[in-house]
Amino acid sequence: MSQSPKVGFVSLGCPKALVDSEQIITQLRAEGYEISGTYDGADLVVVNTCGFIDEAVQESLDAIGEALTENGKVIVTGCLGAKSSASGSNLIEEVHPKVLAVTGPHAVGEVMQAVHSHLPKPHDPFVDLVPAAGIKLTPRHYAYLKISEGCNHRCTFCIIPSMRGDLVSRPVAEVMLEAENLFKSGVKELLVISQDTSAYGVDVKYRTGFWNGKPIKTRMTDLVAALGELAAQYGAWVRLHYVYPYPSVDEVIPLMAEGPFKGHVLPYLDVPFQHAHPEVLKRMKRPANAEKVLERVQKWREICPDLTIRSTFIAGFPGETEEQFETLLDFIREAELDRVGCFAYSPVEGATANELDGALPDDVREARRARFMEVAEEVSAQRIQRKVGKTLKVLIDEVSAEGGIGRTAADAPEIDGVVYVEPATKASKRYKVGDFVSVKITGADGHDLWGEV
């Protein structure tokens, strides 16, 4: 074994799982472990899994198998670690009995305990080698900020609460400290994430915390205002994801539209509507008044005309009729959602939706998903064309001889569109990764933009 023990790491799943991985890696580095980029260079391997849908389960099981084959010493964590097999035993231990240990999600302490058992930590922790912002797996100029864990909802298609538990909000001072450290490290964009961002603080009855001597309620609106104030000091962006459409969201829109936080609290909401017909929403155990949702979307845009709304939907949910599906298509057209993703309903092991009557054939579900995306892409293309001729602020993600690739306030990394920026023709217009630049938009397709500095 090398002088400093080395741990390999495989991170799968969503941004929330990515943050879990970042926290584990940060703790490993704080205790003096080195992170190996290869299996054969590691003394053991940690695999952070996803267990949300069947494809993710198989991907995670395959990754564990590969790590066992290539290295032999594997610790497993993440959502799949909390899943049982048909026999009632732990699924991972049943499929891969040679793993050293298995934990559930957001279990940094348990993972570290397992690492210590099989690979004792070095005597010198090298704390000074770990940046205050922690170890990040994202590019240096943007980072995810997880404000809570778990969810109090029991949507029939979802098993997240059974794996990640009920809502647990992080103390507001802890969140603000992490945000400040990230901005100090050079992060230009914070992406606020959780299972349910709008519910932040519900579990602690919105108790008051303190940050730099100032009281801040453990509540979404108050946290967003505090993050906006902090972001303004660093000329940075704050972007909100996984915003459940509670009435409290109405209070956040003005922060995006006016005042000192405009341009820092981005006019962007990621709101998982899932459907628009009240009967389908009722079967999903989601808010079931689509007319009021449409009114609220229109009101949001009256207050903040630049607002970008991203959402996700499920087509072909059990019992969904053609008429109900057409209602969903009408909603997409009327709400003019900017960015939309859609999944054909897929049964998830353990979800109560599996017990609902009216399961639709695979070809019907997939056909409806395709029809949905055709309408959604048409709406998105119409909205994006309106940006041609405008000058927009762009955060540069990549630079090459062919020019740059960046994103506007309307585009989150990896899931939305990008701006292809022409190479700088003058020294005064040169840019690098992490720079904000003003770009005149010269062209657009259904998803992306083109422009010049």
Swiss-Prot record:
Q: How is the cofactor bound?
A: Binds 2 [4Fe-4S] clusters. One cluster is coordinated with 3 cysteines and an exchangeable S-adenosyl-L-methionine.
Q: Where is the Radical SAM core domain?
A: 137-382
Catalytic activity entry: L-aspartate(89)-[ribosomal protein uS12]-hydrogen + (sulfur carrier)-SH + AH2 + 2 S-adenosyl-L-methionine = 3-methylsulfanyl-L-aspartate(89)-[ribosomal protein uS12]-hydrogen + (sulfur carrier)-H + 5'-deoxyadenosine + L-methionine + A + S-adenosyl-L-homocysteine + 2 H(+)
Keyword field: 4Fe-4S, Cytoplasm, Iron, Iron-sulfur, Metal-binding, S-adenosyl-L-methionine, Transferase
- SMART domains, sorted: Elp3 (SM00729)
Q: Which residues form the MTTase N-terminal domain?
A: 5-120
The yes or no answer to whether the keyword Disulfide bond is present is: no
The identity of this protein, by name, is Ribosomal protein uS12 methylthiotransferase RimO
- Organism annotation: Burkholderia ambifaria (strain MC40-6)
Q: What is the lineage of its organism?
A: Bacteria, Pseudomonadati, Pseudomonadota, Betaproteobacteria, Burkholderiales
